[in-house]
């Protein structure tokens, strides 16, 4: 999984740099109050979550709305995350269990506020982002042909930042956020690193 994630980051970064180099400045057309887009990237588990979960990936869509004379942009997101299980962790906790074929998956529905900094007319613009939402978490595994699963639906928070690149007719962005989900016993924490687009 780390090798796959490394190849993905290098490839996505190269595409982002190439697209930025071809930018011809912002369009003179009137700006719409809304945008749609998508993002994908790596999901890094933290804390107790990282004990049993490998590095993972995520894929999602977004909708943004900018009210006139309001400094923030409102963003709604639907994202799917998937992380593999660490066999060595579960083998240590349950001796004799052998190899487990399973994963952690998560859907999150999030409402965010995005606060940009600097001049919007520039080719690139940093921003802060944060919000709250509903997270549907599920752990699934196959043990000797028997399917085992457990799921929770909990609220969570996220906070982070990124950089938007204004290209000809659309935008790309790089973003890093910290998520904490208020799951039973202990919070589930993770950091997604995302490469995305909006138009």
Question: Would you name each region that the model predicts?
Answer:
Residues 1-32:
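Cleavable N-terminal export/targeting peptides
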Residues 22-67, 191, 198:
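Short glycine/proline- and aromatic-enriched beta-strand/turn motifs that initiate or cap beta-hairpins
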Residues 24, 60-143, 191-193, 197-199:
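Gram-negative (and chloroplast) outer-membrane scaffold detector with strong preference
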Residues 32-34, 53-59, 103-109, 124, ...:
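Residues that define the transmembrane beta-barrel architecture of outer-membrane proteins
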Residues 36-46, 134-135, 172-182:
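Transmembrane beta-strand segments that form the barrel wall of outer-membrane beta-barrel proteins
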Residues 46-49, 94-101, 143-149, 179-183:
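Extracellular loop and loop/strand-boundary signature of outer-membrane beta-barrel proteins
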Residues 83-89, 162-199:
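Predominantly the C-terminal beta-signal and adjacent terminal strand-loop region
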Residues 111, 128-134, 153-163, 176-178:
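Hydrophobic alpha-helical segments of small multi-pass membrane proteins
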């Amino acid at each position: 999984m780390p090798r796959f994630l490394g190849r993905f980051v290098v490839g996505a970064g190269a595409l982002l740099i190439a697209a930025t180099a071809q930018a011809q400045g912002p369009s003179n057309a009137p700006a719409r109050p809304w945008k749609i887009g998508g993002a994908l990237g790596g999901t890094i588990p933290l804390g107790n979550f990282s004990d049993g979960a490998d590095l993972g990936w995520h894929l999602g869509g977004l909708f943004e709305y900018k009210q006139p004379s309001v400094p923030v942009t409102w963003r709604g997101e639907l994202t799917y995350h998937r992380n593999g299980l660490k066999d060595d962790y579960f083998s240590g906790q349950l001796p004799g269990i052998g190899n487990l074929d399973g994963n952690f998956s998560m859907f999150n529905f999030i409402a965010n506020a995005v606060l940009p900094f600097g001049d919007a007319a520039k080719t690139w613009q940093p921003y802060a982002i944060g919000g709250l939402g509903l997270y549907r978490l599920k752990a699934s595994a196959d043990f000797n042909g028997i399917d085992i699963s457990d799921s929770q639906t909990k609220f969570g928070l996220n906070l982070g930042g990124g950089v938007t690149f204004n290209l000809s007719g659309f935008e790309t962005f790089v973003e890093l956020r910290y998520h904490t989900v208020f799951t039973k016993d202990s919070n589930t924490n993770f950091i997604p690193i995302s490469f995305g687009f909006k138009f």
